[in-house]
Amino acid sequence: MARFVVAGASEYLAITGWGIDDVKLAKKAWVFAGQKCLKFDATPVSYDIDVQAMSSEKLPFRLPAAYTIGPSPKIKRNPVVDGPAPPADTQRRLEDCDEEALLLYAKLIAASQIRSPNHVIDLVKGVIEGETRVLASSMTMEEIFQGTKKFKQQVFDQVQLALNELGLYIYSANVKQLVDDPDSPGNDYFSFLGQKRQAEVEGKAKVAEAEARMKGEIGAKEREGLTLQNAAKVDAETKVLSARQQGVGCREEIKVKADVEVYENEREADIAAARAALAVKKAGLDKQSKVAEVEAVKAVVVREAELQLEVERKNALRLTEKLKAEKLSKATVQYETQVQDSNAALYDRQMAADATLFEQVKSAEARKAQAGAKFFEQKLAEDARLYARQREAEALAGVGRAKAELVASMLQELGGDHGALRDSLMIDGGVYEEVARVNASAMSGIQPKISIRSRAGGANAGASSAGAVQQVAAADVYDMLPPFLQSSGGFNKLPL
């Protein structure tokens, strides 16, 4: 009895039995009688492990870690991330290793994991704790603490080597900070080490503070000395500068007095000019104010006149509108009456014009239809004549082609003799008969001159022999030629 088994996305099939030497791994397969199929999950599992180890000085410590471990599947390379693919033999070896890892997992762990889920956890914990303890026992606590990163990497490498024997692969490893073992009383190495570091930091801070305070006091004393030196120097320079400034002050005082007198004179002149300009400006302003007053009075008078004119205009406009309304109502009624009469007359004329136009349109359409029919008949007749001429031309063309073929065949039969071909065509065409007919019609009614000559005697003729008779006939023909030629020359107008 066969059945088809399919594994899930994260599952594999381990098939053993008939026809299989060892173990066959597949994602889907037919399972026949005599075979056994085991479906195992290849999903990685996270393990939180708290390893208790001891250094070479016999100091216990704890190493908390979190590992994500699972069976090693076939790894497909990504050219973008992993770079160019390795050679074919190397790639084959890698794939073989992955296949071997899955086979190891299927043989050693998969079945026991299904029966006892904690079996893999205990196995992994045992491997990690064993490798960590072996590595820690060969190092001092100081080496472990100072090289924590290196120690973690070595633990990871050693654990991975051990797990390779079981077909397991570490997907990720997060090793936490080293801590003291709480189960070992009196073991406070990392706490003491922290206190030591804290004390060292505090000592360095105090030394730095003392150095800063010392530098501050020295700087303050240096500042005080520099201040006294600078004060004495400034006093001496001040006395020299004071004497110099007194002499300069006297000179400047005399110069200032002269400048003050000049300035006062200039100011008096400026004041006089300003007063004169002020008087002129006051006179101009008085004039402008008086002119403005006069203009204001005149403007009031003009505005009163304009307002009075506007009032009179409004009154006249009101009277005009009143008269216009009275007269306009009568004119509007009369206008509307006349408009209605005109519209009625216009409507009658439009109806008559529409009727006339309709008759003309219908008459034009009838004439157009007659003209179209006549044109259609003419077109049909022309088409018939054109078709007859086309058929006649086609017949003539066919006759011409037939004649050409006949002439070509006759010329071929006559051996290329064009003279014989011409005579044959003239005979077939009745050219000679036509020439004889034309000559006969031309000679009808003509009275030719005929002369008959004979050489035969009465008695002697009967007694002549047959040969003599023939000679006499030939002589008669020769005697007749001159008159015949003369007659023909007179008829044909040809010189002979």
From Swiss-Prot:
May be palmitoylated. GO terms for cellular component: caveola; plasma membrane; plasma membrane raft. It is a lipid-anchor. Transmembrane segments: none annotated. A lipid is attached at residue 37 (S-palmitoyl cysteine). Residues 301-328 form a coiled coil. Keywords: Cell membrane, Coiled coil, Lipoprotein, Membrane, Palmitate. It is found in: Cell membrane; Membrane, Caveola. CDD domains: SPFH_flotillin. The keyword Manganese does not apply. Pfam families: Band_7. The keyword Transmembrane does not apply. It comes from the Eukaryota. Belongs to the band 7/mec-2 family. Flotillin subfamily. May act as a scaffolding protein within caveolar membranes, functionally participating in formation of caveolae or caveolae-like vesicles. This is Flotillin-like protein 3. It comes from Oryza sativa subsp. japonica (Rice). The gene is FLOT3.
